[in-house]
Amino acid sequence: QTNIDLLKMKIPNKKYITNKESGSKIIQYIHDDLSYLVKKDRVTYKKEYLDFSKILKERLEFFDEIAISNTLNFIQDIEDDIYIKFNITELQRVIDNNLSNAIKYSFAKSSIFIKLAYINDDEIEFTTTTHSKKIENVKKIFDDFYRENIARGGFGLGLKIVKDICDKNLVIINLDSNEKNTKFAYRFKINEDTIT
C-alpha cells in the first residue's frame, strides 16, 4: 500500500494506479472474509457500542477505488451518530460483503445507493440498492457457494457469512429484486443480544 501511495504522489490521477489500488483492496477484503470463516467457531466476538454511521462511511471510503475502477459511484444517505451494540468484525463483514456485491453486480456506469437510518426508536436499517439484473433465486442467494452469475467471479461465500452473522445477532434481512433494481435491507435492533 505504501508503494501505491508513493506512485500516486508522483503520478496523480492515473487510471492504472486506481486499478492497482483497487486490486490490492479486493485481496484484503477476501483475506478478511477467509480469516473470519477460519476463526468464527473458535473466537468469541464480543459486542460493544459502535458508531455505525462512522464505520459505514469508512468502509465506503475503502471501497471507493474499487467502485471507480468499475465505472460506478456511491450515493450516500447516512444519518450521523447512529450507535448499535455489535461486534466490530462482524459488522464490517456485513457491510463489506454488501458493498462488494453491489459493485460486482451493478450495471456499468450506474450509481449504488447506500442508506443508514432510524426506522423507529429501537431499530435502524442499512440498505444497499443497485441497478442490476434481477436475482432469480432469492431463496438460494444466501446459501454456501451459490452464485447467480459465475462470470462475475467470487466464491459464493460472502452472503452466507452475512446471513450467519445476521441470524446470530437477530438482524432481519429483506431482499427485493426486480428487472431494474435490487435492494438488500438489514434491520438492526439497537441493543439486541445474540441467540444463545
PLM ranges: what are they?
Residues 2-6, 10-66:
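Conserved DHp (HisKA) dimerization/phosphotransfer helix of two-component histidine kinases, i.e.
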Residues 48, 68, 73-83, 119:
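Conserved catalytic submotifs in the C-terminal HATPase_c
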Residues 102-103:
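Short helix-loop "hinge" at the ATP-lid/N-box region of the Bergerat-fold HATPase_c
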Residues 109-122:
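Short beta-strand/loop element within the Bergerat-fold HATPase_c
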Residues 134-145:
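Short conserved segment of the HATPase_c
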Residues 152-161:
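Glycine-rich phosphate-binding loop
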